[in-house]
Amino acid sequence: VLYPGGRVAPESYAPLARAIAVEGGAEVALASMPLNLAVFDPGRADALMDAAPGIQRWIVGGHSLGGAMAAAYAMSSDDRVRGLVLLAAYPADSTELADSGLAVVSLLGSEDDVVDRPTWDEGAERLPADTVYLIIEGGNHAQFGDYGEQPGDGVATISAADQQRQTVAAILELLGRI
C-alpha cells in the first residue's frame, strides 16, 4: 500500500507501482486520500488490505507526508504489515518503530531540498536498527513520483526513470526480506 505525498494525486505514483508489480510480482495499491492529504486518513490501508483477504503479508509505505502517515499506520497496525517503505520521509516524533520488528527501507535523493536532512537523520533513531538506508545520488524529492517539479526542491542530476529504477530495486530487496 503506497500513500502519496501531500497534495499529490495517487496516480502520480502509477509508474513506480507498475514497475514494482511487474518486476516483483507484487500487488500494489495506491491509496487515494481526502484532499490528497494522507493526514486526513492515515488508516486508509485497512480498507485496501481488507479488500484483498488472500494477501497475508503487506508492506506499507509512502512519499514525504504520505511516508510519515504510513509509518504511523505501521506502528499501530496488525501483524499483516511486515514492512515499511519511506520515500523522502521519516517517522514523526510520536512514531516509535525501533522495536517493531518491521523490515524498513528509507530512501532519499541527494539533491532533495524539501526534506530537512537533520530531521530525517533524527527520524532514523525511531526506526529499527536493521533499517536499510539508500541515498540516491543525483535524485531529488519530486522524482519519487511523476508530478513535475516541486517548489523548493533541488535540481536532479539523474533522470526520473533512473531514480525510480533505484527505488524499485530497493523495494524489491525489501519484499525479499519479508
Per-region residue spans from a language model:
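Active-site-adjacent alpha-helix of alpha/beta-hydrolase-fold enzymes
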Residues: V22, L108-D162
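Conserved alpha/beta-hydrolase
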Residues: A17-A38
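Short beta-strand/loop motif that positions the catalytic acidic residue
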Residues: S100, S106-L108
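Active-site nucleophile loop of the alpha/beta-hydrolase fold
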Residues: M33-P34, V85-D93, G109-D113, G139
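Conserved acidic catalytic loop of the alpha/beta-hydrolase fold
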Residues: G43-R57
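Gly/Ala-rich beta-loop-alpha elbow adjacent to hydrolase catalytic centers
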Residues: G62-A70
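Short, surface-exposed "cap/lid" segments of acyl-processing enzymes
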Residues: V1-E23
